[in-house]
Amino acid sequence: MKQQQLEELLKKKGIGPMGSKSLNQDETELLKKLLPDPDVSLTTQATMLTALLTLTPNPYEEHLIRDLHSTPELFLPSELKEFLFPSAEKSFVQLINKVISGQNLSIEEANRAMDYFFDPAVPEYLKASFLEGERLKRETFEENQVFFSRIWDASLRIQTDIPVLIHLCDSFDGSNRTRNYSVFVAALLAAAGFHCLLTGIDSVAPKFGYTSHTILQLAGKTPLLQTTKALDELKTNGWTYLDQKEFTPSLYAMKQMRKEMVKRPFLATFEKLVLPIYSTGQNYIMTGYTHPHYKEELIKQLKASGRCDKAIVVKGMEGSTHMAMHRDTICITLDGHTIKENVVSPSDYGLHITEEKQDKSIVPEVCLQEGLDAFEGKDNDARRNIIYQTALILDKTGLANRNEVTGRLQQLIDDGSAMKAFKNKT
């Protein structure tokens, strides 16, 4: 109960630099009781304290902050006092306090912060505080370059000589209001002769939505393949799935911390882009975003990193690669050094625009069955959506002609090639 109360306060206060709301008098009085409570997660307490110190306070919050400074022994766990009374020596807390004060980190400082972050001996409440502080301050482009690079370096990776490898990079916290047919898109790409790698996780905060891992498990597949076995499957069947547990175990081990800090950190932006199987030829990425800030941030980070040859970033449903069938979708492409932005529509590929509503009651079993029905020949919305996303990938990367691609993909479904590629998945 107490943990849930603090999480609810954090959901209100710790949203971000623009969306956070102030706490009222009753809420600040409740917070006084929850911050020192030993029955509440220290990670959640540290994250809440970070939000309180970072964002502009209202009068009730100002009064609480004064109480924290004057009598910290009454209102804070001993571990968190250093946030108010930092030592002079270089430490993770020193860097966190710099972020809390609204100052940006230098490249050297950002790297030092990530040294602490990936050190298993450093307490998770400090890591959560750092993530929250960066979220609320808003990471600079240079900071994000460091964060992306360090997450990339922390991930296990093997190379392949596959000429072109398409990476479907959905957000790891999944979907809980909309469909996502990524596993079927991957199978259809494979049927068309193009290799595709899916990555993800079983479940992670803040949404704990269903993922490609979920769908594969429901389909009787094995989502936890070792990287070498996944590469073998990629070569023989044209598509495969790799789980974060296999390629970035250090981040996978932080799942509980991410649950207790409640809000989405910068980890979510970059963990999906680490490409654990990497082609020595061409690597093409498709990923999605939700918030407008990340539209530009994602594509520019991909360009600056030089880690992919082409990229497609769409304003997908729930930030995924799944595009709406009932309206235009913003689509940004990267081709070498050239970035272009336009809008795309199902009608661009000869597909009917159909109504699509968010549905909080959606379950992954339904998505799996709809995808299987589509591959069995049923003319349903899933079929059109799978074709739409696959056609767009092939068109925008120059792998197929827009005027011909839809008919080709329809034929691959109708002749059973797509279902064969799906069924052959381990």
Go through the PLM ranges and name each one:
Residues 1-178, 196, 353-358, 369-379, ...:
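Acidic, glycine/proline-rich low-complexity segments that act as flexible tails and inter-domain linkers
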Residues 48, 130, 216, 271, ...:
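Residue-level signal for inorganic ion chemistry
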Residues 54, 136, 185-195, 218, ...:
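Alpha-helix C-terminal capping segments
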Residues 161-232:
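A generic, well-ordered mixed alpha/beta core segment in the N-terminal half of proteins
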Residues 168, 197-200, 224-226, 241-244, ...:
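General beta-strand structural signal in soluble alpha/beta enzymes
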Residues 225-290:
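Phosphate/diphosphate-binding glycine-rich loops and adjacent basic-rich segments that engage nucleotide
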Residues 282-323, 327:
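Glycine-rich ThDP/TPP pyrophosphate-binding loop and its adjacent helix/strand module
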Residues 337-395:
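A hydrophobic, small-residue-rich beta->alpha segment in the mid-to-C-terminal subdomain
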